[in-house]
């Protein structure tokens, strides 16, 4: 089962849809956002991306003249739009992160709730799994990803423990990993700690932040002037990248200026960041950490 779409009304309204326009849903998933966009189109066209083969099955009832599913990672958006004869689009929507379906499918290895292989690949055609990271990365490498992507406070100590443990026996299952983590998790906050470690591994396996950077950089090339960008993120690492790119035109530092001192920013923010209201958070657990940012191409 796929999750109830988060911030559905707000994210689609943020696109300011032209019924004859061309739009892209870069994270098709269960198709909730795509179906809502299609309701607003008449002569327009929607292209949707998803790298997960399970999600592709959800699109079968939508395939038609106004909808095309592209089974690929959104980091290649420019390439695949060109292959479909599309140069510029009117809007782009992204609902980042992991889907409820992926979490609730035990054998995918995304959840702390099930004993399963340490997989965590969104695209199961790629080779690297979470088990490969745990068992093959150096202590320094593990320390880095646990600290950067999971914001794990005792990342160095945990990295040392994982390296020591895998000498005796490879850590190949979620239960084996959690057994190691249990000795280092803050008392009373075990689930949060496990989730932080799993998040770090998932981001590394799928190169999520690098893919997001690629998407944002290419969005300024594929969006028409006046085109809208509507992005929902679920943790501070994602949101910071989106915020900085929209406000400064780059991921770090201040906006660049030309020879005349004019700021070079490809986007302007449309309103403030939007968080789900209390009712949606109560109704949809996944919405609790969501944040929507809308921007317009200059």
UniProtKB/Swiss-Prot annotation:
**What biological processes does GO assign it?**
rRNA base methylation
Know the name of this protein?
Ribosomal RNA small subunit methyltransferase H
The gene from which this protein is expressed is rsmH
The record's GO CC annotations read: cytoplasm
Provide the function of this protein. Specifically methylates the N4 position of cytidine in position 1402 (C1402) of 16S rRNA.
Spell out the Pfam families in the cross-references. Answer: Methyltransf_5
Reaction equation(s) it catalyzes: cytidine(1402) in 16S rRNA + S-adenosyl-L-methionine = N(4)-methylcytidine(1402) in 16S rRNA + S-adenosyl-L-homocysteine + H(+)
Q: Residue ranges of region Disordered?
A: 255-298
What is the organism field in this record?
Cytophaga hutchinsonii (strain ATCC 33406 / DSM 1761 / CIP 103989 / NBRC 15051 / NCIMB 9469 / D465)
